């Protein structure tokens, strides 16, 4: 087993993992990384410089590679998506969100490998949604536990040029993590991502959706990552939302993304 160092990035979320090469993991080292991942919700591995084959091999240790509707993947690498700078007008991730909530079984986790990054800007933020739930009053927890919300793929459909009704799915607003057993708020940006609760109108839903969203992303449960080329970051899509900040103009920002299939939220 490699001797790894796990250092918390904030009290609430995130850890930096050093002393390991993700392209050459033994079973014991992977087990230690998995434990840290489930505990800290997202991990940063500096200086990895992963090639696509290495990233795919590491991803497959976590489960089956996910392929999402409306996304075009890299030729020769099914499931590997090259993220490039689309310009601020076309950026669809500049809000707090979970990945692929418009499908019945959203991704379990996401792995990003930084290739070429701006000299400044282009940061990504993550928020601990366990804490967002746990810091609600008992009364609010009880009320939300029975609610389901509509999640749409409006933003990605618009960018993909798809007309008509965007794909959507209904999920519980409070979900239980299938591995840790902890409860997390499961929401998204009110309006275009989460327009309403199930069996409620948008007008009826919006005040509570706005309040939940603002409550969830309190600064005391957020980590903001300043990317360096070669970084690998992975996060748990069952208990964290993230936000990609587009403040870098036309500067080059290239990352490779792989996601792992998840289960239907309950």
Placement of each model-derived feature along the sequence:
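Non-heme Fe(II) oxygenase catalytic core, chiefly the N-lobe of the double-stranded beta-helix
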Residues: 2-232, 237-266
